[in-house]
Amino acid sequence: MSYTGFVQGSETTLQSTYCDTSAQPTCDYGYGTWNSGTNRGYENYGYGYGYGQDNTTNYGYGMATSHSWEMASSDTNANPSASGSASADSVLSRINQRLDMMPHLETDMIQGGVYGSGGGERYDSYEACDSRAILSERDLYRSSYDYGELDPEMEMAYEGQYDAYRDQFRMRGGDTFGPRAQGWARDARSGRPMASGYGRMWEDPMGARGQCMPGASRLPSLFSQNIIPEYGMFQGMRGGGAFSGGSRFGFGFGNGMKQMRRTWKTWTTADFRTKKKKRKQGGSPDEPDSKATRTDCSDNSDSDNDEGTEGEAAEGTESAEAMEKGSRVDGEDEEGKEDGREEGKEDPEKGALTAQDESSQAKRKLQASKKSQDKQKKRQRDRMVERIQFVCSLCKYRTFYEDEMGSHLDSKFHKEHFKYVGTKLPKQTADFLQEYVTNKTKKTEELRKTVEDLDGLIQQIYRDQDLTQEIAMEHFVKKVEAAHCAACDLFIPMQFGIIQKHLKTMDHNRNRRLMMEQSKKSSLMVARSILNNKLISKKLERYLKGENPFTDNPEEEKEQDEVEAGALDEGAPSEATELTEGVPAQPPVPLEPAPGTTTPPPPPPPEEEESPVPLLGGALQCQIRGIPGLDMEDDEEGGGGP
């Protein structure tokens, strides 16, 4: 009677056809129908090799092509429906031939064919054997079959070249693979049925040799893709079939050992040098270097089979240290030579440095002298500007032209400021300030009459303030005229339409009202700072007594103008303090001479003691950048002012 069963693998589907020659009952374990009679061989099974994917010759052992069992084309193209013992015997004879070749493959694996330079880049060759030679007479296919019930002959199967592996991995199971490996090792020694299979399998890096995969409820098919049962805890390892992940444990499969060997080769000597030095410090001085190196390197390895590799690493470490010592000696010699050269060149370098210092000092002196000259010129220009420029101290208004000053005195802006000051100060004090501004304007007119070429002087002042004259034409930079709105902090092109449009905007009207209130408050602070001056306070006392305080000595008036200019420059609450502190430094007022005696006029004060007075006060200077004749602070910064 003929039955057909199917074995489902991860990649291929194998159709198994056999002929049942006995009348004994059968048990289906999912791998076809297995005979449970006394015949425990594979002689009664006929296997067809009809595959659904391109008739490949790889039968699912998870191996590279070089380690696969290649079948002849006649076998591959056999009729799937054929039955009979002849075809089964021919197939099994070919399988037994492959099995007889396994001892030769084992010898090659021990000599490095798999653990380092095997033909397969990913998996080891499938290690199998004829289970009939080593198993007892018990039922091979019983589901509760386990390692604990093997015959002594089964244990003898391990005697040979793998004894060292078995003992070493049993001792290192917990150290290398963590808690899970310790559990497997304990279960293997304690004789638990299920865990002992796992522990034995992982402690002995032999694949499935001599074991025929016991510990599972079913025997795997010889052509099944999953040679090792699929258990969730093993997913993530790398090998054949169920082990689809990376080679974390580093043994049992050729690729893991190969990668570890490559890792050994890629390690640098610096990894061993530090540990070796620590070992030398902590251990005895008589301990050889190779022993210390091997002890340190064993911590980084996953297998104890790399003695040759450790020897290579030790030799590489010693050679690297020798090279390092040689390089250190050479480096010390080179450093000594360089030190000698530096000592020999020390005096010439000092001389060169001295010359450089002298040249730098000379340049600094030239720059300082140039700055002092520019400062002196600027100071003279500022003094000339003070004499010919009209100034309204409370409104912070300055102009070179007389008609503009008259218009300002009659403007609403000027009157509102004085009205605000009158509300904060006594009426007589406010009237004194009004008379003070009027008298100052008259004195400025008298000084302007003494100047021969007033218009030329004004033009010269404007030219000096033009910083674009020093810029070459290839830079295409020139001076332009623009209107500056201090309330909006905005520069406007000098075009009538644009200016009128800006004046009608809502933002400008809101900002100008706020600016007006701020300007009034600032004018009050300026008025108080002026009145706090001792000379002006004496004039105020005389004015309150009904006398004319503006007919005093011209030199006294000059000092008062300078003090007032300082107050205008600040325009802040600190102005009063600065003015009161600067009063003692001023020369005292000369006494009136007795009648009938003549005294020479007092000498003018030196120019160095006078503080420069810019065209505009500090409060407005930042708001009128670029306006001709008013940008004195910018000129000070460009000319190297204090």
From Swiss-Prot:
Signal peptide stretch: none
Phosphoserine: residues carrying this PTM: 284, 298
Motif (Nuclear localization signal): 275-280, 363-365
Biased composition (Basic and acidic residues): 288-297, 338-350
UniProt xrefs under InterPro entries: AKAP95, ZF_C2H2_AKAP95
Zinc finger (C2H2 AKAP95-type): 392-414, 485-508
UniProt biased composition (Pro residues): 585-605
Annotated keywords: Acetylation, Cytoplasm, Metal-binding, Methylation, Nucleus, Phosphoprotein, Repeat, Transcription, Transcription regulation, Zinc, Zinc-finger
GO cellular component term of the entry, any: PML body
Region Disordered: start-end pairs: 265-382, 546-642
PANTHER family per UniProt: A-KINASE ANCHOR PROTEIN 8-LIKE, A-KINASE ANCHOR PROTEIN AKAP 8
Name by which UniProt lists this protein: A-kinase anchor protein 8-like
Protein source organism: Mus musculus
